[in-house]
Design a protein with these regions (language model features):
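Positively charged, small/polar-rich N-terminal and surface patches that mediate targeting and assembly
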Residues: 1-97
Length: 97
């Protein structure tokens, strides 16, 4: 059976978190624009699919970058389409400062 987890991450530090997902987990991700319900302010949401064994690592990574980030973890039954693979990705050109 297919087993994966999807994370919805809402944070003002979305760029830093996204960079770390790429560098540390070698995963692709998507940014969504959102509107906060209470304050009606603009938000960015990161959506990423990872294996269950990567959950502890990504939670720690998020906590390090933004302890106040809102994170929702959902079960993913299937992931299809361009850009999704568990194969090794290209070497990174980004270097974290």
């Amino acid at each position: 059976a297919y087993s994966a987890r999807g994370l919805l991450i809402i944070s003002n530090k979305y760029e830093q978190i996204g960079k770390m997902i790429d560098l540390k987990l070698d995963r692709g991700f998507t940014y969504f624009k959102a509107l906060g319900g209470y304050k009606q302010d603009d938000k960015r949401v990161i959506y990423v699919v990872v294996s269950p064994r990567e959950i502890a690592t990504i939670k720690q990574l998020i906590r390090q970058e933004d302890p106040n980030a809102f994170v929702s973890i959902i079960e993913v039954h299937e992931a299809l389409g361009e850009g999704f693979t568990y194969k090794q990705k290209r070497h990174h050109l980004l270097i974290r400062k």
